[in-house]
């Protein structure tokens, strides 16, 4: 009963010998699986060697700890020969956001992802309209 299927009574396939017949057919089914496993393993080993022995992380040089210069630098790269135009504070701030040592942008979550009440005492009660506080206390899970 080896190699027969439960479905269809175990009859031969109409095309003659299938891929699962004999040791060659078994190898043809396992070859792609083995090749995939070896490729993924080799990639993992190469990444481990690269990040462990070769790759060196680099950082941009830190700003000196001394006092800041009194004269501010121009907010954005000015074109040569064009006199600098005073820009509003918001515009100059947006030009400096990407500069090392400049202000960092304030990242905010979208309104749907923000926590509305960080303090549990400020959280509104789940009291429905026309419901007494005693009924709301009895409804809460213990």
UniProtKB/Swiss-Prot annotation:
User: Source species, please?
Assistant: Homo sapiens
Query: Could you tell me where the Gly residues compositional bias lies?
Result: 1-19
The cross-references to InterPro entries, in alphabetical order and at most eight, read: InaF-motif
Q: Where is this region: Disordered?
A: 1-22, 61-83, 99-142
**Protein known as:** Putative transmembrane protein INAFM1
Where is there biased composition of kind Low complexity? Answer: 99-111
Q: How does it sit in the membrane?
A: Single-pass membrane protein
- Where does this one sit in the cell? Membrane
Q: Where is the composition biased (Pro residues)?
A: 64-83
State the GO CC annotations.
Answer: membrane
């Amino acid at each position: 009963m080896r190699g027969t299927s439960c479905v269809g009574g175990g009859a031969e396939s109409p095309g003659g010998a299938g891929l699962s017949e004999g040791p060659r057919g078994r190898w043809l089914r396992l070859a792609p699986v083995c090749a995939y496993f070896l490729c993924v393993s080799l990639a993992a080993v190469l990444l481990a060697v690269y990040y462990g022995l070769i790759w060196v992380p680099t950082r941009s040089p830190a700003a000196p700890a001394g006092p800041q210069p009194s004269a501010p630098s121009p907010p954005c790269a000015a074109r040569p020969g064009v006199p600098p135009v005073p820009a509003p504070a918001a515009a100059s701030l947006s030009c400096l956001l990407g500069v090392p040592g400049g202000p960092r942008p304030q990242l905010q979550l979208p309104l749907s992802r923000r926590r509305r009440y960080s303090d549990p005492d400020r959280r509104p009660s789940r009291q429905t309209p026309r419901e007494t506080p005693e009924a709301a206390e009895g409804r809460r899970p213990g």
